[in-house]
From Swiss-Prot:
PTM text: Glycosylated.
Organism lineage: Eukaryota, Metazoa, Chordata, Craniata, Vertebrata
Catalytic activity: [protein]-peptidylproline (omega=180) = [protein]-peptidylproline (omega=0)
Positions that bind Ca(2+) 1: 154, 156, 158, 160, 165
Prevents secretion from ER (motif): residue ranges: 215-218
Protein name as annotated: Peptidyl-prolyl cis-trans isomerase FKBP7
GO molecular function, one term: calcium ion binding
Gene name linked to the record: Fkbp7
Annotated ranges, domain EF-hand: 141-176, 185-218
Domain PPIase FKBP-type: 49-141
Residue ranges, annotated region (Disordered): 197-218
Signal peptide coordinates: 1-19
């Protein structure tokens, strides 16, 4: 799993914002958490700023209809995101605090910590909808996005990351990973990194681009 977390250095750089529709008056509502399974051995639990790797399914609490399944996207790979900074809706940020790798939870999220009065996804999530998520957390690691990581990748110290430098960094992580991927997968990851972060298209990722945030709702 280590590789997946390292990749999020690049793939998780989008903007941080609270869920739509949240107000101070509504903030008294609570996210309800039911622990379905928690491993006996848990040496590390999730906290704000950690990089998580997880699958989750989303349902409308009203009728149980499913509106989201992470297993049906990205060839079934678990999602990568930094906890507590708005990469996911606020209710999930709250619900996934203090989780162990291998833990499963069922959570109920009120509208104020989800999509509020606006709803989302062309009617799939109606206004003022309470949501239910089933979450499975695979692993937790310290969030890697930092100037130190940038410098580690920037081997020639020219203050920009080339494809060759990032490819080398990824290759080292592939060698450490318990489930190594083939070259085609590594190439696809590299292309995705530049697609999402090389905003001026010059073939390099600058310090500014490295820290540019984009938005991803779920």
């Amino acid at each position: 799993m280590n590789l997946l977390f390292r990749l999020a250095v690049f793939l998780s750089l989008w903007c941080c914002s609270d869920a739509q529709g949240q107000t101070k008056e509504e903030s008294t509502e609570e996210v309800k958490i039911e622990v379905l399974h928690r491993p006996e051995n848990c040496s590390k639990t999730s906290r704000k700023g950690d990089l998580l790797n997880a699958h989750y399914d989303g349902y409308l609490a009203k009728d149980g209809s499913k509106f989201y399944c992470s297993r049906t996207q990205d060839e079934g790979h678990p999602k990568w995101f930094v906890l507590g900074v708005g990469h996911v809706i606020k209710g999930l940020d709250i619900a996934m605090m203090d989780m162990c790798p291998g833990e499963k939870r069922k959570v109920i999220i009120p509208p104020s910590f989800a999509y509020g009065k606006e709803g989302y996804a062309e009617g799939k999530i109606p206004p003022n909808a309470t949501l239910m998520f089933e979450i499975e957390l695979y692993a937790v690691t310290k969030g890697p996005r930092s100037i130190e990581t940038f410098k580690q990748i920037d081997t020639d110290n020219d203050r920009q990351l080339s494809k060759a430098e990032i490819e080398l960094y990824l290759q080292k992580d592939f060698e450490k990973d318990a489930n190594p991927r083939d070259k085609s997968y590594q190439k696809a990851v590299l292309e995705d990194i530049f697609k999402k972060n090389d905003h001026n298209g010059d073939g390099f990722i600058s310090p500014k681009e490295y820290n540019v945030h984009q938005h991803d709702e779920l």
